[in-house]
Structures are given as C-alpha cells and as structure tokens.
Amino acid sequence: MYAQPKLTSAEYVQHHMSHWKLNLHNFTFTDGGFWTLNLDTLIISVVLGALFILIFYIIARRATASVPGKWQNAIEMAVEAVDGTVKDSFHGDRSLVAPLALTIFIWVFLMNFMDLVPVDLIPRLFQMGGVEHFKAVPTADPTLTFAMSITVFVLVVFYNFKMKGAIGLGKEVLSRPFGWYLMPINVIFRLIDEGVKPISLALRLFGNLFAGELIFILIALLPWWSQFTLGMVWTLFHLLVITVQAFIFMMLTVVYISLAAESH
C-alpha cells in the first residue's frame, strides 16, 4: 500500500472514497444525484457473485462420496454450519431459506473480503484503463447494503402474506401488541418496527466496512516502515470483522423471515 505522491492526504482519502459513477439521465460518467449508478459496486458485486456460483457449481459437479478434496470439505462444512444455524432459528420449510442464507453469507463475505486487498491495487489497474475513480469494496457503498436490506424486507413481507394471509396479517397489525382498543398505536408501532429492520440491517454492514476501508486508506498514508506492521495487525482484526458482519447479516435475515413465518 502506498500513497500517490501528487495528492495531499485529504485528496488521497477523497480519491479512494469516490465511486466510478454513471449518470442514468444522460448516461455519462458524471454525478447524477439520486439517478447515479456506482459502476464499481455493480461490477465487483456481480463478478464475486458469479465467482461464487461458478466455484460451487464446479465443486458440486466433482463431488464424491469416497474421499472428498479440500475444497469439497470446506464447502460441506460451510453448508452444514449454515443449515444448522437456519434449523435452530427457522422451524418451517427450509428449502428456500437455507440456500438463501448460504448465498447471503458467502456473497457478503466475499464482498467484505475486498477490503483486505491493498487499497491502491485495483484502483491503479482501472486507472490504466482510463477510469479515474474505482472503489473496490461493494459493502462500503450504502446503495448496495440498502438494496440488499430492502430485498430482505420484501421477502419478510412475502412470508407474512404467505403464512398469515391478508386478513390474518391485518388482524395482527391492528391488534398487536396492545389489543384492539389501541389500534392506531399498534399500527404506528408496527410501521416503526418494520421500517427500522432494513435501515439497521443496511447501516450496520455499511458502517463497519466503511470504517474498515477508511482505516486501511489512512494506514496507506503512513511511512513505509510502519505500513506493514499496522497493516498486518488491522488485517488480522478486520478478517474477524468481515466474517462476523457477513454472519450477522445472514442471521438477522433468517430471524426476520422466521418471525414473519410464525402463525399466531
């Protein structure tokens, strides 16, 4: 990791925290406000998702019941661990929830792992192709974390309607937790409760990865003789953080769906 000599410290940080943007109004590489697509986030997340699917597909095709290889062992351990976690939290049909949980955990972990790549490596490669800004950590972008949390929210609503029906869900919203006589308060509490879930889910992941990325950038500004030591210490700690954050996002998704699927 090294800083660009032509930039001040503030400019260096700003440069590495800026996205490769596409203005959806006129399809130019400018800031379009709300109608801006962060191409770097899209590219890295899609590539990592495709890599995840490809690796699992290849190993599934080569899976053997005799003596499994190291990759097969690792994936079987991950699948069993996630399935066991889902089984403890979700007591209905796990045919959709377990694969969803596994996908979320692996995909979020891979996107988080990009935070451990040297901060100048990927931006420099894209600079050679004429791209001035490139932010390589998708989960440090709130647009992606909110997109994922909103998708989880849609699944929660779907399970609410699927398990309780429109009438049953309506009764639950109007009567819980304070009974029928306080219906307006019940509705307000329910709206707040449901609205906070995707917001907290998105901000928790974004905040941790944004802070981690910023610290790596600040370490890159230090003298070369201190970068390695501090970088290694923070990398070891951050490896735990990215794993825990992927697990928390997966776990909360399962819990929210489980709560929605419960019949009262």
Curated annotation (Swiss-Prot):
InterPro entries: ATP_syn_F0_a_bact/chloroplast, ATP_synth_F0_asu, ATP_synth_F0_asu_AS, F0_ATP_A_sf. One of its GO terms (biological process) is proton motive force-driven plasma membrane ATP synthesis. It is found in: Cell inner membrane. The chain crosses the membrane at residues 39-59, 97-117, 139-159, 205-225, 239-259. GO terms for molecular function: proton-transporting ATP synthase activity, rotational mechanism. SUPFAM superfamilies: F1F0 ATP synthase subunit A (SSF81336). GO terms for cellular component: plasma membrane; proton-transporting ATP synthase complex. Signal peptide: none annotated. Gene3D superfamilies: ATP synthase, F0 complex, subunit A (1.20.120.220). Pfam families: ATP-synt_A (PF00119). Keywords: ATP synthesis, Cell inner membrane, Cell membrane, CF(0), Hydrogen ion transport, Ion transport, Membrane, Transmembrane, Transmembrane helix, Transport. It is a multi-pass membrane protein. It comes from the Bacteria. F-type ATPases have 2 components, CF(1) - the catalytic core - and CF(0) - the membrane proton channel. CF(1) has five subunits: alpha(3), beta(3), gamma(1), delta(1), epsilon(1). CF(0) has three main subunits: a(1), b(2) and c(9-12). The alpha and beta chains form an alternating ring which encloses part of the gamma chain. CF(1) is attached to CF(0) by a central stalk formed by the gamma and epsilon chains, while a peripheral stalk is formed by the delta and b chains. Belongs to the ATPase A chain family. Key component of the proton channel; it plays a direct role in the translocation of protons across the membrane. This is ATP synthase subunit a. It comes from Coxiella burnetii (strain CbuG_Q212) (Coxiella burnetii (strain Q212)). The gene is atpB.
